[in-house]
């Protein structure tokens, strides 16, 4: 994007009082030259670049994220002869990926498709979709947070919830993306599927539910491979044709692009790294200097970092309980290895261009750029590849046995699924590992870049209070590193990146960040008592809570009791923020309950301490209407804690188990029960 330039054209007013012309002849001449020069520059900059002859691939589907000025998906469908539109609600990219795969497969069934972001479309046009022959709307919708729609599906969700439109004649299907460890499993997809039927729409195929805690990829391919026959039967279409390799983007190598026009890691705006300007968000992150990066663990072989980021001058604001998102970069050695395996010159400047000229999503990531930049900043190279990637990689195998192995793992056969589970998932193989082990598979690097998902920001609970640290954000992060069954050492992308970001003297070390607001909040009345359950790094948001309550006490305000249940392995190894916690206890701000699971013969966890303190917990949440918070592991700890709370409410509150469950749901509705958990 060329920077805008302005010319100060204010003329000096003559000091005399006569009726002289506002602009003299010389002024007019100079102005004409300036205007002419500006017009020449503008027209020249708008000229299309000449494209080298190296470009290839075809694509019958489009990713259509229409602009605000052209948000009619109906017009696009009609203009391009399409009848299938796949909407997605996605927070991390998986929903969008599934939508793209469905639209791409539609060509096999004579249904030309496009992918659409509901946030960028006029969703009231769903009423008109029935006017297109054999039309079908598919919704791939993730449930996010506390049973909420994703950011980009929020307006559609509100519209379908509050509206009372007649959707008779609309053919639809829904696939949901959720996680069974969370209470509101696939709530959004379940509701939308039911609501569309209530509004008169025709369900072409049953609701599909994907569980990210198990194998969402298997859930999706099992659903879609039953979905397509149902669609064919509904529309009277013959079965699918032969599967062919279809490329969505064509390669354009651009060796002559000026260096200042090449993306070097910017998320959206070119030169946004060098020229920072607010507001800062997911598309325009702030480069935050790291002020402190220190180790919290005292021993034990594991690492936990305390990081302090400066947000001074960013105009970003946060509250205790919010999240900070960081954009990591991939390990240089992995990037180099992938380049070698694909026989690529990583410093080649290129663009991947959508073959559908009607699509407003011209590139899968910022282009033009280099392969090195794309693999470092834009693509997820350490993730476990999904089956559709294996299917396309198989076409580049020269060894038939290796080709068959990849094809088998991409199939829906029981043997193929079992092989995918053991060889890919259990072995934690990423794209680099696969190409290392499948030695005859050497795909072109541009196709690899097309196939890999976008590198997503990593979210961390902020472990500080803006009352005490208004221009700093604190982060508490455990370094992820483990040995796989193949003997390789896998490392977490973000924590490895952060571990190496050590401030050195006067030289600033920066990371791109933005703030994400949360519903995880302290009570509006400081005198309200609270219970916090946060083992390990689950302590992070509660450190911010306690800082804030200490700050209020120091100001002379009345603050309710703050009870923290914290757990770790050993007091001598991973008791993080020990001195701070002990100091708050001494000052009377904190009532600390600590469980050290491996400091005695029988393991003790926070769950055990909660059971022992049944009277205290009932007093806080039952008799004094206090707030209850959980932060940490969703799959085990959070479930156990909730079950214990149900038991305490039943015994101490004289409730049935069903009433106790309803009591917790009522607390959730009142924002008195909050969870910040992950799996």
Swiss-Prot record:
Domain of life of the native organism: Eukaryota
Family, as annotated: Belongs to the NADPH--cytochrome P450 reductase family.
Higher taxonomy: Eukaryota, Metazoa, Ecdysozoa, Arthropoda, Hexapoda
CDD domains xref list: CYPOR (cd06204)
Name of the protein described by the UniProt record: NADPH--cytochrome P450 reductase
GO CC terms: cytosol; endomembrane system; endoplasmic reticulum membrane; mitochondrial outer membrane
Enzyme Commission numbers on file: 1.6.2.4
PANTHER family (alphabetical): NADPH--CYTOCHROME P450 REDUCTASE, NITRIC OXIDE SYNTHASE-RELATED
Residues binding FAD: 458-461, 476-478, 482, 492-495, 678
Annotated keywords: Endoplasmic reticulum, FAD, Flavoprotein, FMN, Membrane, NADP, Oxidoreductase, Transmembrane, Transmembrane helix
Keyword Secreted applies: no
TM segment ranges: 22-42
Cofactor binding summary note: Binds 1 FAD per monomer.
Membrane topology: Single-pass membrane protein
UniProt topological domain (Cytoplasmic) ranges: 43-679
GO molecular function, one term: flavin adenine dinucleotide binding
Cofactors demanded by this protein: FAD; FMN
Entries under InterPro entries matching the protein: CysJ-like_FAD-binding (IPR003097), FAD-bd_FR_type (IPR017927), Flavdoxin-like (IPR001094), Flavodoxin/NO_synth (IPR008254), Flavoprot_Pyr_Nucl_cyt_Rdtase (IPR001709), Flavoprotein-like_sf (IPR029039), FNR_nucleotide-bd (IPR039261), NADPH_Cyt_P450_Rdtase_alpha (IPR023173)
SUBUNIT field: Interacts with sturkopf.
Lumenal-facing ranges: 1-21
Main location: endoplasmic reticulum
């Amino acid at each position: 994007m060329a920077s805008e330039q302005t010319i100060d054209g204010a003329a000096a007013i003559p000091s005399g009082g006569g009726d002289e012309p506002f602009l003299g002849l010389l002024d007019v001449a100079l102005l004409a030259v300036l205007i002419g020069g500006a017009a020449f520059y503008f027209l020249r900059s708008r000229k299309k670049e000449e494209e080298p002859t190296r470009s290839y691939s075809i694509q019958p589907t489009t990713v259509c994220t229409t602009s605000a000025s052209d948000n009619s998906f109906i017009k696009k469908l009609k203009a391009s002869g399409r009848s299938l539109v796949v909407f997605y609600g996605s927070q991390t990219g998986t929903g969008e990926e599934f939508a793209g795969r469905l639209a791409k497969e539609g060509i096999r069934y004579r249904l030309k498709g496009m992918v659409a972001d509901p946030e960028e479309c006029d969703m009231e046009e769903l009423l008109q979709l029935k006017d297109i022959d054999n039309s079908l709307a598919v919704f791939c919708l993730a449930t996010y947070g506390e049973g909420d729609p994703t950011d980009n599906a929020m307006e559609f969700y509100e519209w379908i919830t509050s509206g009372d439109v007649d959707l008779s004649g609309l053919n639809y299907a829904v696939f949901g993306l959720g996680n069974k460890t969370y209470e509101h499993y696939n709530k959004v997809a379940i509701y939308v599927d039911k609501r569309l039927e209530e509004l008169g729409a025709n369900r072409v195929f049953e609701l599909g539910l994907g569980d990210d805690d198990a194998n969402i990829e298997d859930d999706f391919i099992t659903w879609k491979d039953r979905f397509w026959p149902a669609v064919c039967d509904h529309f009277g279409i013959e079965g699918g044709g032969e599967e062919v390799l279809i490329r969505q983007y064509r390669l354009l190598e651009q060796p002559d692009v000026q260096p200042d026009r090449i993306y070097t890691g910017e998320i959206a705006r070119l030169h946004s790294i060098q020229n920072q300007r607010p507001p800062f968000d997911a598309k325009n992150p702030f480069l935050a200097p790291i002020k402190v990066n220190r180790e919290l663990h005292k021993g034990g072989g594991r690492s936990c970092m305390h990081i302090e980021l400066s947000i001074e001058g960013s105009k970003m604001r946060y509250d205790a309980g919010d999240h900070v998102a960081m954009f990591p970069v991939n390990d240089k050695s992995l990037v180099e290895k992938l380049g070698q395996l694909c026989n690529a010159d990583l410093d080649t400047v290129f663009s991947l261009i959508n073959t559908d000229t009607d699509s407003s999503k011209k590139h899968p990531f910022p282009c033009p750029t280099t392969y090195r930049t794309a693999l470092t900043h834009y693509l997820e190279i350490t993730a476990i590849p999904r089956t559709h990637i294996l299917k396309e990689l198989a076409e580049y195998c020269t060894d038939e046995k290796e080709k068959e192995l990849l094809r088998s793992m991409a199939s829906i056969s029981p043997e193929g699924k079992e092989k995918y589970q053991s060889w890919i998932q259990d072995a934690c193989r990423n794209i680099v590992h696969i190409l290392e082990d499948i030695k005859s598979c050497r795909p072109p690097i541009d196709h690899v870049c097309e196939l890999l998902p976008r590198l997503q920001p990593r979210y961390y609970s902020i472990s500080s209070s803006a009352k005490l640290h208004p221009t700093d954000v604190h982060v508490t992060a455990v370094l992820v590193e483990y040995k796989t069954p193949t003997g390789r050492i896998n490392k977490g992308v973000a924590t490895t990146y952060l571990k190496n970001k050590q401030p050195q003297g006067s030289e600033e070390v920066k990371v791109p960040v933005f703030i994400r607001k949360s519903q995880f909040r302290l009570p509006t009345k400081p005198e309200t008592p609270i219970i916090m359950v946060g083992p390990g790094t689950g302590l992070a948001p509660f450190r911010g809570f306690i800082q804030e309550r200490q700050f209020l006490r120091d100001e002379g305000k009345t603050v309710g009791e703050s009870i923290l249940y914290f757990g770790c392995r050993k007091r001598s190894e991973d008791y993080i923020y020990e001195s701070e916690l002990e100091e708050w206890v001494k000052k009377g701000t904190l009532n600390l309950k600590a469980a050290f699971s491996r400091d005695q013969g029988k393991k003790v966890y926070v769950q055990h301490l909660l059971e022992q303190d049944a009277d205290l917990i009932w007093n806080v949440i039952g008799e004094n209407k206090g707030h209850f918070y959980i932060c940490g592991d969703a799959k085990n700890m959070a479930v156990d804690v909730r079950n214990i709370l149900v038991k305490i409410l039943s015994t101490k509150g004289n409730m049935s188990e069903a009433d106790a469950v309803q009591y917790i749901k009522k607390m959730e509705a009142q924002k008195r029960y909050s969870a910040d958990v992950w799996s």
